[in-house]
Regions:
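Charged helix-capping and loop-helix junction motifs
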Residues: 206-208, 274-277
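Ordered, soluble secondary-structure elements with a strong preference for glycine-centered loop motifs
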Residues: 164, 202, 269-273
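A short, acidic, flexible beta-alpha connecting loop/helix-capping segment that sits on the rim
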Residues: 294-301
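ATP-dependent adenylation/nucleotidyltransferase module used to activate substrates
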Residues: 2-176, 233-240, 244-245, 250, ...
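Short, low-order "capping/linker" segments at domain edges
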Residues: 301-312
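Mid-to-C-terminal catalytic subdomains of enzymes
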Residues: 165, 171-215, 219-231, 235-238, ...
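Residues at alpha-helix caps and immediate loop-helix transition turns in enzyme cores, especially N-
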Residues: 73-74, 186, 271-275
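A short interface-forming secondary-structure element
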Residues: 255-272
Length: 312
C-alpha cells in the first residue's frame, strides 16, 4: 500500500502534498511558458508532465544526448514523453570537448550543466519560451551540487525545490498520476562511475554502459559498475573480441578494474558461483582486466572510495 492509500497515517502527508502541488501549478502558470531540462529521471519526468498539464502547448521538454547518458535511458525517456503526449526535443551536447569536464574534477557536474544551459538559453529564446526549469527538489538542499551553481548563473528555475517538494513527495505524486518513474532507482550519469581525478572518456563510458546493461539484463536493479584505472601498459580501448564495442580509431587506455555494486538484497544472488563466473566472463569480454564485487553494495558516490586521498 502506498503512502497515498493509507487512510489515517497519511492524512497530514496528503494535505501537505496537495498544498505543494497547488503551489507548483500556480508557479508554472506564472511562468507563462517553459522549457524543462529533461533526463527521464523521477524529478524531470514529473516536472515535464506537470508543465505539459498546466501549460498545454506552451511547455517543451529537452533532453541532452551525450555519451554520459545510457542509450536505454534515452529510449525510455523518449517513450515516456510519447506515452504521456508531451513534446520533447533531443539536443546534442559537447561537454567532452571541454578539458575541464574530461579531467573529472570534483565539480565536473558544473561543466556538464554549463554546457547544457548554454545551449538551452538560445533554444528557449528561439522557441519563444519564457522560462527554463530543471528538476532539482527540496531533498537536494544541502547536498554538494555543482550543477546548481551553473543553474544560478543562467537563471534556471527549480520549481520543485521552490515549492518545497521532496523526493518522497514527488514519487507519491508520480504514483497518483500513473507515471512509470514512481519507483525508478536514482540514476546518476555514467561519468559518476569514474573516480574524480581519473579522466572521463567516451571509451570508458561505453565499457561501463555495456557492463551495467549486462547486469540489468540479468535482473539486477540497483547497479553501478565503478571503473578504476590500473597501472600498466596501455591496452586497446575495447575488447577486440567484442566488435560492437571495439573502436579501432580510439587511443589505447590503461587496463581497468570493474568494481560492481548492487543493492544489499541483490548481493546473495550475484554471489552464486554460476552467476559470478558468467558476469566476470562477460565483463572481461567487454574489456576489463579484473572484475570485483563490492561487499558493501550500492551506495551513492561509491566511485570515489578508492580515489587517492589528499595528504594532511
Amino acid at each position: 500500500m502506498s503512502a497515498l492509500d493509507k487512510p489515517s497515517v497519511s492524512n497530514h502527508f496528503l494535505g501537505v502534498v496537495d498544498a505543494k502541488l497547488t503551489s507548483l501549478r500556480k508557479s508554472l502558470e506564472g511562468f507563462g511558458s517553459v522549457m524543462v531540462a529533461y533526463s527521464g529521471g523521477v524529478d524531470s519526468v514529473f516536472l515535464a508532465f506537470m508543465a505539459h498539464q498546466t501549460l498545454p502547448g506552451r511547455a517543451v521538454a529537452v533532453i541532452a544526448d551525450s555519451p554520459s547518458l545510457p542509450r536505454s535511458e534515452l529510449r525510455e525517456a523518449l517513450q515516456i514523453a510519447a506515452d504521456f503526449n508531451f513534446p520533447v526535443r533531443v539536443l546534442k551536447t559537447a561537454e567532452f570537448a571541454n578539458a575541464d569536464y574530461v579531467s573529472n574534477p570534483l565539480n565536473r557536474c558544473y561543466f556538464c550543466k554549463h554546457e547544457l544551459f548554454s545551449q538551452l538559453v538560445p533554444l528557449a529564446k528561439e522557441l519563444g519560451l519564457a522560462v527554463i526549469a530543471y528538476g532539482e527538489n527540496a531533498s537536494d538542499v544541502g547536498d554538494f551540487r555543482p550543477g546548481a551553481e551553473a543553474a544560478k548563473e543562467f537563471h534556471i528555475r527549480a520549481p520543485l525545490k521552490e515549492v518545497g517538494l521532496t523526493k518522497a513527495e514527488i514519487r507519491a505524486l508520480s504514483a497518483r498520476f500513473g507515471l512509470p518513474t514512481t519507483d525508478k532507482p536514482q540514476m546518476a550519469c555514467l561519468s559518476s562511475r569514474v573516480p574524480h581525478g581519473e579522466a572521463v572518456t567516451e571509451q570508458k563510458l561505453g565499457m561501463i554502459e555495456a557492463a551495467e546493461g549486462h547486469l540489468r539484463s540479468l535482473g539486477f536493479v540497483d547497479v553501478r559498475v565503478r571503473h578504476h584505472e590500473l597501472p600498466g601498459a596501455p591496452v586497446p580501448s575495447m575488447s577486440a573480441t567484442n566488435p560492437q564495442l571495439n573502436d579501432l580509431t580510439a587511443p589505447p587506455t590503461k587496463p581497468a578494474l570493474a568494481r560492481i555494486e548492487v543493492g544489499a538484497t541483490e548481493l546473495p544472488r550475484l554471489l552464486e558461483a554460476t552467476n559470478a563466473a558468467r558476469i566476470a566472463e562477460e565483463l572481461k569480454r567487454i574489456g576489463y582486466a579484473h572484475v570485483t564485487l563490492d561487499l558493501l553494495g550500492y551506495r551513492r558516490g561509491g566511485a570515489n572510495d578508492l580515489a587517492p586521498q589528499p595528504v594532511g
